[in-house]
Structure formats: structure tokens, C-alpha cells
A protein has these predicted regions:
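Cytochrome P450
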Residues: 1-402
Length: 402
């Protein structure tokens, strides 16, 4: 079936390869939402999944222990060396007490207060990248994705994990490989990423500094339970993977602002709106369309349908974040919207994004720097296009005139 048609049971069926779904997923998932709180999504080569389309149902599922994340929730490239596999099992693959323990140990390094303390260092990175962006411009046009939004998160990760300046070019290459997706380039980069992460943890242990890993080693030093080096290496790996989310959030936010001149003008006139603006941009045009699928641990009845044990279940954030039952006038971009709107852009429940405060800080600093440096910033004539990815809303490029 195509975009939001229903099967004989009345549950909407969404073909993730349908051109309309790929062109405008918010609209496609939104049509399914208005038909039913529960739908099915499918694509050739992947198992069908149940999808919660409305805000209330999505929020409930993300907090329901009957649906769990695990290794099967992720697709990994083939040929990864055995010694790397132990480092690849991040918190996202853990549940229950195991997940709670790791989350408790690492959370002190990811508080809003710590993100605020790191903010001046993020600002310095942004200013350097903006200087370089001008150098990449040809006839006044530059690709903001390639030369700003993509390198920024990896530069921040290097800064926050204490990676030496001399080693950062290699880490930029790692970030580019991760951004490329699940291809051979990604698989080939994994051993080098793990080796670099092991070295970063060892350096922070022997020479503590003002960085995230040293924070974790110091905070836990006096406690019986503390993160092992292998767990810290896994955290660095997780940061490298998660860095792609701020990339897409920043690029989407710039694209959206440049297409809404009245909202852009309001933000320029009142920079104090920036925290609310970033929350609204995350809700309205966030990069996560579908959450990482969870597996039902037992038979569960949802909205009149039987979810069998082992079935995959996801939440359509693209439709939940525009659900009129939860958010007033949800299809309107309003940078002054009150944060109480309660979007799910960073997830919900035990797996709420650990780095949400850091992602917000990066995005706020990036947008503020761009708007300040380039008052005439505009989309170039060659309009950007989105990649055909039904799970992640991400641009192929972002050509702008400076």
C-alpha cells in the first residue's frame, strides 16, 4: 500500500519507499495520525513495524517497559573486528537495572549546568568554523551543511573529550565516515575510532583535564561503583554516533528559518527568543522522524490491535510533534511558543536523550553565531534537497549565500 492507505483491519499502512512519504514525511505520517493512533510501516528488505502516530500514544510507548531496545534494534555493518564489538553496546541497547546504572554514572557530565559551562568553548569552535566557512565560499555561496553543521558536533566532541588538536583531523574523518551511514567506509573506520577512544580515556585517566571523561573519572573516584574504562570508551563511541543528530538539527533549523522570513526577523530582533526557538525548531522540523524500533517483550494490546511478543514498535515523532490533540495550531512555526508544548524531539522515558542539554547548547550557539555573522544569510538559488530516508529528516546539502 502507499501513503496512509488502510488495510482490511482499518490500520493505516505506510510504504516507507513511497515518493510522497519521502518527500513530505510530516504530512504523510500526519495523515495516518488522523486516521488512527496506530499504523503499520513497511519497506522491502525490512520487517514491518507498528508505529504510534499520536503524541499521547508515542509518549506512553517510549516509557513502557513492555517495549525494549536491544542489539536487534540496530543495523550494524558486517566485518567489524571482534575486539570492537564489546565497545559498541551502548546505553541505547540496555534496559532495566543495567541501563539505570550506566545512566546514573554518566549523567553528571551531561547536566544543563555542565553544558552551560562548556558553552564558551562551543562558541569558540563556532567562530572558527564561521571563519573557515567564508573561505569555502565561491561567488558568495557555501554549503552550510558540509562546512559548518557537519563538522561542528565532532569538533565539540573532541573538545569535550580532551582530544589533542593534532589528533582532531583524524576525528573529523571519523565523523565523516559515520555521517556516510552503514557502508563499507563506516565499517572500515570503526577500529580506528575505537583505538582513538581507548587512547582518549587512557589520557584522561593519566592526565585529568577539564573534559567530559575527566569529569566522569573524578565524580566517581570516591565511589565503589564507577565506570570502567571499557564503559567510558563505549560512551565516546556513543557520542561519535550521536553527533549526527545535532548536525541534522542545525541544518534543518537554518533551512526552516530561511524559509520563514517573518520568524527569522523576529529572532533577529529578539535574540532572547533563541532557547524557545530551538525547542520549536526541534518540534517542527526535527531530524528524528521515527524512533529506534523497540521489540515487544510480551503480547500487548494497543488501540484495539494485538502486538505480538517480538513485534517491532516505533513512534512517529514527525506526526506526534504535530498532533493537534497535544499542541495548539501544530503546523504553524512559532518561535515564541511556550516550552510547555512538550515535544518529543529528544524522546521520552528512560532513554530520553542524555545529551539533550548539550545538543540545545550547540544549536543555540550555532544559530546565534550564524545570524550575527551573516545578516544577509539566504538560501542559494540551488535549493537544498532532503535525502530519501524515512527515519531521519536530513538534507543532502545546504547551499546558502553569505
Amino acid at each position: 500500500m502507499t501513503d496512509a492507505e488502510t488495510d482490511v483491519s482499518g490500520v493505516p499502512e505506510i510504504d516507507l519507499t513511497d515518493a510522497e512519504v519521502l518527500r513530505d514525511p510530516a504530512a504523510a505520517y500526519g495523515r495516518a495520525r488522523e486516521l488512527s493512533p496506530l499504523a503499520r510501516v513497511s519497506a522491502p528488505g525490512m520487517p514491518a513495524m507498528w508505529v504510534l502516530t499520536r503524541h499521547e500514544g508515542a509518549r506512553a510507548m517510549l516509557n513502557d517497559p513492555r517495549f525494549e531496545l536491544g542489539a536487534g534494534s540496530y543495523m550494524r555493518p558486517a566485518g567489524i573486528p571482534e575486539h570492537c564489538l564489546a565497545y559498541m553496546r551502548t546505553m541505547q541497547e540496555m534496559e532495566g537495572p543495567e541501563h539505570a546504572r550506566i545512566r546514573r554514572l554518566v549523567s553528571p557530565a551531561f547536566t544543563p549546568r555542565r553544558a552551560a559551562e562548556f558553552r564558551p568553548r562551543i562558541e569558540a569552535i563556532v567562530e572558527t568554523l564561521l571563519d573557515e566557512l567564508e573561505g569555502h565560499a565561491r561567488d558568495g555561496t557555501a554549503d552550510l551543511l558540509a562546512h559548518f553543521a557537519r563538522p561542528l558536533p565532532m569538533e565539540v566532541i573532541c573538545e569535550l573529550t580532551g582530544v589533542a588538536a593534532a589528533d582532531r583531523p583524524r576525528w573529523r574523518e571519523y565523523g565523516a565516515a559515520v555521517a556516510a551511514g552503514r557502508g563499507q567506509e563506516f565499517a572500515d573506520a570503526i577500529p580506528a575510532i575505537m583505538e582513538a577512544a581507548v587512547a582518549a580515556v587512557a589520557r584522561s585517566r593519566s592526565e585529568p583535564g577539564d573534559d567530559l571523561i575527566s569529569d566522569l573519572l573524578g565524580v566517581q573516584a570516591g565511589q565503589e561503583d564507577r565506570p570502567a574504562d571499557a564503559e567510558l570508551v563505549t560512551l565516546v563511541w556513543h557520542l561519535v554516533l550521536a553527533g549526527q543528530t545535532p548536525t541534522n538539527l542545525i541544518a534543518n533549523a537554518v533551512d526552516t528559518l530561511l524559509r520563514h522570513p517573518a520568524q527569522l526577523a523576529a529572532l533577529r530582533a529578539d535574540p532572547g527568543l533563541m532557547p524557545r526557538a530551538v525547542d520549536e525548531l526541534t518540534r517542527w522540523d526535527g531530524p528524528v522522524l521515527l524512533t529506534i524500533p523497540r521489540r515487544a517483550r510480551e503480547d500487548v494490546e494497543l488501540h484495539g490491535a494485538l502486538i505480538r511478543a517480538g513485534d517491532l514498535v516505533t513512534a512517529a515523532l514527525a506526526s506526534a510533534n504535530r498532533d493537534p490533540r497535544a499542541i495548539g495550531d501544530p503546523d504553524r512555526l512559532d518561535l515564541g511558543r511556550a516550552p510547555a508544548a512538550g515535544h518529543l524531539g529528544y524522546g521520552h522515558g528512560p532513554h530520553f536523550c542524555l545529551g539533550a542539554a548539550l545538543a540545545r547548547a550547540q544549536t543555540e550557539v550555532a544559530l546565534a553565531g550564524l545570524l550575527r555573522r551573516f545578516p544577509g544569510l539566504a538560501l542559494a538559488a540551488s535549493a537544498p534537497g532532503h535525502l530519501p530516508d524515512p527515519g531521519t529528516w536530513r538534507l543532502a546539502s545546504l547551499p546558502v549565500t553569505l
